Amino acid sequence: MTVESPPSDAEFDASQDQAPPACVMSFNASDATGAGGSAGDVATIAAMGAHALPVVASIVMRDTAEVFDHHPIDADVIAEQARSILEDVTISAWKVGFLGSAEGVSAVAEILSDYPDVPLVAYMPNLSWVEDDEQQSYLDAFRELVLPQTEVLVGSHQTLTDFLLPDWDNERPASARELAVAAGEHGTRHVLVTSVMLPAANSPDQYMDNILASPQGAITGEKFERFEVSFVGAGDTLSAALAALLGAGTDLHSAVGEALAFLDQSLDAGFRPGMGNVIPDRFFWALSSDEEDGEGEEDDDDGNGGDDDGDVDPDTDSDTDADADADSGDDSGPEPTDTPGAVTPPKVLRHIH
């Protein structure tokens, strides 16, 4: 029996007719629910056609309903995780989520500063579950060390208002531009503000806006109808998707639209694995055509046409407002292939590969 030797490195490299995917390093907490944190980042970045390099900054104890506790990783261990892979792999973008402690923020910020040309998407989750003193030191460190390096700061309207304009006492809510101005004072170039409440004209329903803004004004955004559905992991999904798109070279305006469309479809396909909140399904596009047709028939039989394209307030622990937008997502399903059962990502994502 003849045993063929594996290809050499040179032969393997020559056989690759496509460039490798964009590599995105994520700094985030470990979340055993798989809804957010590093697990959510890995799933989202992979679903977007990029490759995730997850660095764990904290261990969060939670279920799908609430956070119980967290244990920050030692700052030196965070740095060693990142430096080890950065010496080997070229990265295209950063995603920063919950970093566990002020010391963790400092360690990550020092690493980011060594790569000023790599775009950084920073997500500010709802940290109301963290002790007040610990929360304040964390936010102060994040404001001083991470914001100056941030291309896009992502967060819900309420969370970003509390973070950027803690003394806001105007009866009207702060605008996205005002939040961008406040972030810009610390060096952040853009904010992506989600869950901006809007009254619907001549309707008792409420709508939410998602707005990308700079200190000069609003740039782009999408309005979605609000639904009372609780999600967890939406904010990490949106910010990780945006980081993957920027890492792949997509311009910011287009990347925000595609990231919002991806979140919209992920939430529409979301599932409830336990007794708590709904988790986004980042691989909604991996459903085969036959399964899609079958589900559509079942929906029609039930009288529910499946038009609940959802989007949500993307806070890590308080995703309580889902919003729907029938026009925001790319509703083209997986294209036919020559291989039975094979599927491809939705068209909105396909240019990454």
Question: Which residues does each predicted region cover?
Answer:
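Charged C-terminal helix
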Residues: 3-4, 18-21, 72, 253-302, ...
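Conserved N-terminal subdomain of the carbohydrate kinase-like
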Residues: 3-26, 38, 42-129, 136, ...
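Acidic-glycine-rich active-site phosphate/pyrophosphate-binding loop
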Residues: 12-21, 37, 205-221
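Short pre-catalytic strand/loop immediately N-terminal to key active-site residues, enriched for Gly-Thr
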Residues: 27-33, 219-232
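Short, small-residue alpha-helix embedded
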Residues: 44, 162, 229-252, 256
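Phosphate-handling active-site elements
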Residues: 49-53, 218-220, 245-259
